[in-house]
From Swiss-Prot:
Gene symbol of the encoding locus: sptl-1
Function as written in the Swiss-Prot or TrEMBL entry: Component of the serine palmitoyltransferase (SPT) that catalyzes the first committed step in sphingolipid biosynthesis, which is the condensation of an acyl-CoA species and L-serine. The catalytic core is composed of a heterodimer of sptl-1 and sptl-2 or sptl-1 and sptl-3. Required for the specification of abicobasal polarity and development of the gut lumen.
Source taxonomy: Eukaryota, Metazoa, Ecdysozoa, Nematoda, Chromadorea
UniProt name for this protein: Serine palmitoyltransferase 1
Lipoprotein as UniProt keyword: no
Source organism per UniProt: Caenorhabditis elegans
Swiss-Prot/TrEMBL catalytic activity: L-serine + hexadecanoyl-CoA + H(+) = 3-oxosphinganine + CO2 + CoA
Keyword annotations from UniProtKB, A to Z: Acyltransferase, Lipid metabolism, Pyridoxal phosphate, Sphingolipid metabolism, Transferase
EC numbers on record: 2.3.1.50
GO cellular component, one term: endoplasmic reticulum
Family: Belongs to the class-II pyridoxal-phosphate-dependent aminotransferase family.
Amino acid sequence: MGFLPDSWHFYIETLLVALLAYVVMRNRSKRQQEKLSKKLTERQKDELIADWTPEPLVPETPQDHPVLNPKYADGKMTKDVSIDGEKYLNMASTNFLSFIGVKRIEDRAKQTIFKYGVGSCGPRGFYGTVDVHLDLEKELAKFMGCEEAVLYSYGFATVSSAIPAYAKKGDVIFVDEGVNFAIQKGLQASRSRVEYFKHNDMEHLERLLLEQEQRDKKDPKKAKSVRRFIVVEGLYVNYADLCPLPKIIEFKWRFKVRVFIDESWSFGVIGKTGRGVTEHFNVPMEDVDMVMASLENALASTGGFCVGRSYVVGHQRLSGLGYCFSASLPPLLATAASEAISIIDEEPSRVQKVTEMAINGQKKLQDALSGSKFSLQGCPESPMKHIYYNGEDEEKQLDTFVETVFTKNHLLLTRARYLDKDELFKIRPSIRVMFQHDLTEEEIQRAVDAIRVVAHKF
């Protein structure tokens, strides 16, 4: 029993140490409370307030930021625009087919206003459907060679609504890293698993599809409920190049995936008659599950549409959020788009002229930038080109370039700007150069000469 005294001795020492720690902490806490309880004098309060420097609610905006130095254009955004009373050559807008200002389209829009007013008064499913909406859907379906089309009132909402209308949680979507912001928002809303492949890298896409194939073999029961999609752009707005559609269609049949194409930038300008990348690559429309496009670029109207098989498109009338809950497209803009489609059908040479202009313009721009710190990117057929600066402080140098040709040469270009914090992948800063139907050879040469002179000053 000799072990008992030692045991009790240990317990007593532990208790004393704990008691000592409690007393020390209690006294410290008491002193802090007494210190805090002392009232500050008015003078002390004023001194504390004077010493306090609050953090800004938003970061400071640099004085040279474009938002603080806006340029106001008067009148229509045709090839010639008036800014602060002076005339400028416009190579910054997406009016590729020069439909803005066409009297035939304007007259049709005016007639529509006299008949329907300026709005449609509700979403498509709630008294917002007018006969001109149905007419335009039929015309779009016929133009694209599809069974049915569905019309949206806003181009951005078309793409961001169409994707989550089909892809859900548990599905997998294979997406090019270079897709535009509208597609990114649609992917986010779908809650699907997204697998990104390098821009136009078909070997990388094939590896991802093979990996998914192996997952499906390991769990065939789960594989039956997983839907697979490939989402690409016809003409990538961030790169001005085309998707390799034939290879994508090959993967579609090989790996049993559905293919969605955003033709917002290729519709009306790519292909012999402006029907997009399917026409350009001679791919049957039946091989593509759905085509999405905006009416706000080549057709110079507003809104967007999706085309495909009837059972695919019809599903959006109940599941497309932008279709169900947004006010429908104003009738005057629907008839304006209809008239623009009629002109493309009647004058396919309009599309072909823009294509030739883009091809020749690319050669001239490449020659103009040769030997400078600037380079050009874009496929020859694209009426949109990107100019990059190969050096430090890209954004500042590109802004200086745009401002210089604006002030000295009366040439209107635009910097491609992005929401850097929201973009999934960093996009290289660039200047966009747009070609449109009404530009003459002399005007294009004048713009190229101005770009050449400014580019070689850096």
